C-alpha cells in the first residue's frame, strides 16, 4: 500500500513515498526534494558467505540523463560507465552507511540509487544518501541507522544548509557532513583557507540539520519498518579464542613492536601461518567444508588478537607502530626538478610513503569537459592519482583507475584547487599526476604535498603552498588516543582516517571516514588542532625545498600571448569549416597537421580574446601577426603587396594576408588592354595592388593598374 510522508526541511519540501514502486526489492523508497527525485532500492542476498573476511556492500549511483532533459552523446545514445561524479557520489553514500551494519554480517547487500529528476538547487547526492538509509532501515536488513547527510555552505559569514547553485558559487565552504542521530561519521569538504574553529562550527551546524532528517526517518521506520532478519554468521567459541591466544599472544605482541613495516608484516604473517598450519593438521579428519570453516574461525581469532593487542599498546602504553610519539610526524624529505623534460616535477617522501608528482601545462582549449547531470561545464585544473601495486610490494591488476584512485585524486584536486590562479591570471589548463611509488598510509596527503611543489616548480603562481596530513583515532574501552600522520597499520586497525589539507592560513580540504558509529565534537576539535600543528611542520620542509613558485614556466612548457580582437571577427579567424585558422596553424608552425605535437595552439573566445600557445616565441609572434592580418580591414586608396591565389577568366584573386583576398578584374590588371589573365598573373605570383574599396555585396576590389600608374 502506498504511503506518503512529508517534512518541511529548511524551507523546501522533502517527500517520501513507499509501497508503490520496485515492490520486489527488499526495500525501496522514492524521495522528492524540491524537483529532485531519487528512487533508492536495496536488495539482500538469501545466503551469506560466512567464510568471507569482508562485508559485500555495493552502492550504485545511476545518473540518468533524462533526469536533466539530455540525450546521451556518442553513437550508442545510452548511458555508459559511471562518470567520476557518480563514482564519488556512490562512495559518499557507502562511507557513512558501512559502519552501521553488524560486524559479522556477510550477506551481499546492493543499494541502487536511480536519479530520476534533478533540480540543480537540490542535491541529488544528499537526496540519494537519505533515500539509501531509509530504504535499508525500513527493510529486514540489519542496519543500525538511520543516517543522513547535508551540504553546508557559508556566504558572507552566514552558514547555510543545502545551499543553492548561486549560494554555492559565492560560498567559501563546500562541506558535506553525514551521521546518525547521535554522532558525525563522514566528512568531505573543500574550503578557501577556513580556520579550524570556523570549520568545526560548520560541522556542528550541519550535524544539527542531520538530526532533523534522522528524526524524520525514525518516524517512518516506526510506522512501516520490517522486523530485522536472522542472519547466518560464524560462531567462535570462547575456548578457541583462549587456546589460540595462549599459543601466539606474546609473539604477536613482540611482532607489533617491530618498527620496520616489511619486517613487522613478514613476522606477523609467519606467526599466523604457523598457527594456521598447526590447526590444519588438527582438523585433517574433517571434510573439506568443515575444515575450511574451522580454519576461517582460527584466522578471525588471530585478526582479533592482533587488533586488541595493537589498540592496547597504543592507548595504554602510548606506543605507536613505528615507535613515534602520538603527535610525531614520520621523517620528511622533498625534492623538485627530477624530470628534465616535464613542465614541473617534485618528489615528496614521508616515512615509507612516497609520491612523484608531475605538472603539465596546456592550452585552455585542452580543458576537461564534464557532461553529466550538471550543465556542461569545463574543468581547467585536474589532479590524477595512480596507485600501482609495486608501491606496496605486491602484484595485481593494472588498468583503468578504480573507485579508490578516483576518490584520492578528487581529494587532492579539491585541496589544491583552492589556490590555483584564475584563468585571467594564468591562462593555462593544468594537469597534475601523482604517481605513488611507495605506500605505508596517507598517500593522498603525500600527493597534495608533492602536487603543490610540482605546481610551484612549473611556475604556476599558486596563492599559497598547501600541505596535507592524515589523523587517526584508536579507541580502547572508554579511552581513546588521536594519532598524527597515521601509517598503514594504524589506518587498518584504527577507527578513523581524518585527512586535513591546508595552507598556513587555513583549511582547504577535509575527508573523514570512520569504522565506529560516530565521533564527538571534542575528538574533531582535537584532531583539527593537532593537524594544524603538523601541517606547519610539513610546510616548513616543502618551503625549504622550493620557497615560491618559479617566475617563469619551463622552457618545455608553452608560452602564451593574449590579445583582443573585435568579437565579430572571430568567425573570420576561424574561416569556413575552420580553413583559415587551420592554415594559420600549419603555416606558422611549419606542420602538416594541426594535431602535430609541434603545432601552435590557438584559443578563440566569444568575447574576442585570442590566446596563443607555443614553446617558441617566434612562432607565437608569427601566429599573432597572421591572426591580426585576418582581422585587419584594407583601407581604400592604400597600396599593398599580395599573392595571386586563384586565376579565373575575368581576373584573379590576390591574397593580401591570410583570410583577406580581393578580385583584380581583368580590366584592372594593366594600363594596357589585357587579352588573357595569365599573360599578367599566375597562381603564386606576387603582385602590387591598390585597394579600390568594396562593392555593394561587400566584396573587396583591387587594382594592379592603379598601383603601377
Write out the residue ranges for each language-model feature.
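Conserved phosphate/anionic-ligand binding catalytic regions in large, soluble enzymes, centered on
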Residues: 27-29, 122-140, 336-359, 440-460, ...
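Short, hydrophobic beta-strand segments
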Residues: 113, 185-190, 231-235, 246-256, ...
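Single-stranded RNA-binding regions, centering on S1/OB-family and related RNA-binding modules
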Residues: 558, 567-709
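Long, basic N-terminal domains or extensions that often function
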Residues: 1-232
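Extended amphipathic alpha-helical scaffolds
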Residues: 1-45, 49, 232-375, 558-572, ...
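Long, charged amphipathic helices and adjacent flexible linkers at domain junctions
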Residues: 231-238, 537-563, 617, 621-641
Amino acid at each position: 500500500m502506498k504511503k506518503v510522508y512529508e517534512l518541511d526541511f529548511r524551507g523546501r519540501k522533502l517527500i517520501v513515498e513507499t509501497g508503490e514502486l520496485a515492490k520486489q526489492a527488499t526495500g525501496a523508497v522514492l524521495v522528492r526534494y524540491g524537483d529532485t527525485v531519487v528512487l533508492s532500492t536495496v536488495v539482500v542476498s538469501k545466503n551469506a558467505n560466512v567464510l568471507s573476511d569482508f562485508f559485500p556492500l555495493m552502492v550504485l549511483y545511476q545518473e540518468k540523463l533524462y533526469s536533466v532533459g539530455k540525450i546521451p552523446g556518442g553513437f550508442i545514445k545510452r548511458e555508459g560507465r559511471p562518470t567520476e561524479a557518480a563514482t564519488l557520489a556512490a562512495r559518499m553514500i557507502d562511507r557513512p552507511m558501512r559502519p552501521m551494519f553488524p560486524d559479522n554480517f556477510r550477506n551481499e547487500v546492493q543499494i541502487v540509487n536511480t536519479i530520476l529528476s534533478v533540480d540543480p538547487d537540490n542535491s541529488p547526492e544528499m537526496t540519494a544518501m537519505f533515500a539509501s538509509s531509509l530504504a535499508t532501515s525500513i527493510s529486514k536488513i540489519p542496519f543500525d541507522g538511520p543516517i543522513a547527510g547535508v551540504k553546508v555552505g557559508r556566504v558572507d559569514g552566514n552558514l547555510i544548509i543545502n545551499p543553492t547553485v548561486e549560494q554555492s558559487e559565492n560560498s567559501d565552504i563546500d562541506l558535506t557532513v553525514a551521521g546518525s542521530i547521535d554522532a558525525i561519521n563522514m566528512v568531505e569538504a573543500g574550503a578557501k583557507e577556513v580556520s579550524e574553529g570556523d570549520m568545526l562550527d560548520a560541522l556542528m551546524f550541519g550535524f544539527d540539520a542531520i538530526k532533523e532528517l534522522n528524526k524524520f526517518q525514525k518516524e517512518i521506520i516506526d510506522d512501516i519498518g520490517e522486523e530485522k532478519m536472522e542472519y547466518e554468521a560464524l560462531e567462535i567459541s570462547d575456548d578457541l579464542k583462549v587456546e589460540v591466544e595462549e599459543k601466539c599472544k606474546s609473539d604477536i605482541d613482540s611482532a607489533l613492536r617491530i618498527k620496520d613495516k616489511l619486517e613487522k608484516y613478514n613476522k606477523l604473517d609467519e606467526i599466523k601461518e604457523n598457527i594456521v598450519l598447526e590447526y590444519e593438521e588438527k582438523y585433517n579428519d574433517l571434510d573439506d567444508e568443515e575444515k575450511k570453516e574451522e580454519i576461517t574461525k582460527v584466522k578471525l581469532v588471530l585478526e582479533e588478537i592482533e587488533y586488541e593487542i595493537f589498540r592496547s599498546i597504543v592507548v595504554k602504553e602510548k606506543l605507536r607502530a613505528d615507535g613515534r610519539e602520538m603527535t610525531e610526524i614520520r621523517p620528511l624529505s622533498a625534492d623538485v626538478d627530477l624530470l628534465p623534460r616535464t613542465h614541473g616535477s617534485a618528489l615528496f617522501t614521508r616515512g615509507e610513503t612516497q609520491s612523484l608528482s608531475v605538472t603539465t601545462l596546456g592550452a585552455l582549449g585542452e580543458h576537461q569537459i564534464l557532461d553529466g547531470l550538471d550543465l556542461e561545464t569545463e574543468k581547467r585544473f585536474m589532479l590524477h592519482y595512480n596507485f600501482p601495486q609495486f608501491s606496496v610490494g605486491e602484484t595485481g591488476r593494472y588498468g583503468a583507475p578504480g573507485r579508490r584512485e578516483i576518490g584520492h585524486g578528487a581529494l587532492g584536486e579539491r585541496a589544491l584547487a583552492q589556490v590555483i590562479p584564475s584563468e585571467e591570471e594564468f591562462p593555462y589548463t593544468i594537469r597534475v599526476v601523482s604517481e605513488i611509488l611507495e605506500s605505508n598510509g596517507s598517500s593522498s596527503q603525500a600527493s597534495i604535498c608533492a602536487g603543490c611543489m610540482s605546481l610551484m616548480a612549473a611556475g604556476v603562481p599558486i596563492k599559497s603552498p598547501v600541505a596535507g596530513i592524515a589523523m587517526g583515532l584508536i579507541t580502547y574501552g572508554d579511552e581513546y588516543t588521536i594519532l598524527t600522520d597515521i601509517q598503514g597499520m594504524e589506518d587498518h586497525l584504527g577507527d578513523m582516517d581524518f585527512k586535513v589539507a591546508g595552507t598556513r592560513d587555513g583549511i582547504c580540504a577535509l575527508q573523514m571516514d570512520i569504522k565506529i558509529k560516530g565521533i564527538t565534537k571534542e575528538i574533531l576539535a582535537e584532531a583539527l588542532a593537532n593537524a594544524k600543528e603538523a601541517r606547519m611542520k610539513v610546510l616548513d620542509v616543502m618551503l625549504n625545498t622550493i620557497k615560491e613558485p618559479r617566475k617563469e614556466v619551463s622552457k618545455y612548457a608553452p608560452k602564451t600571448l593574449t590579445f583582443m580582437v573585435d568579437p565579430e571577427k572571430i568567425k573570420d579567424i576561424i574561416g569556413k569549416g575552420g580553413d583559415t585558422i587551420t592554415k594559420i596553424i600549419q603555416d606558422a608552425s611549419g606542420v602538416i597537421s594541426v594535431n602535430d605535437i609541434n603545432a601552435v595552439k590557438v584559443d578563440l573566445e566569444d568575447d574576442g580574446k585570442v590566446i596563443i600557445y607555443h614553446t617558441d616565441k617566434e612562432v607565437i609572434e608569427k601566429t599573432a601577426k597572421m591572426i591580426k592580418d585576418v582581422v585587419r580591414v584594407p583601407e581604400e586608396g592604400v597600396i599593398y603587396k599580395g599573392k595571386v591565389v586563384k586565376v579565373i577568366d575575368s581576373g584573379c584573386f590576390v591574397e593580401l594576408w591570410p583570410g583577406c583576398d580581393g578580385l583584380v578584374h581583368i580590366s584592372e590588371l594593366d594600363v594596357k588592354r589585357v587579352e588573357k589573365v595569365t599573360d599578367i598573373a599566375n597562381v603564386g605570383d606576387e603582385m602590387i595592388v591598390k585597394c579600390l574599396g568594396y562593392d555593394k555585396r561587400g566584396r573587396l576590389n583591387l587594382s594592379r593598374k592603379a598601383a603601377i600608374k
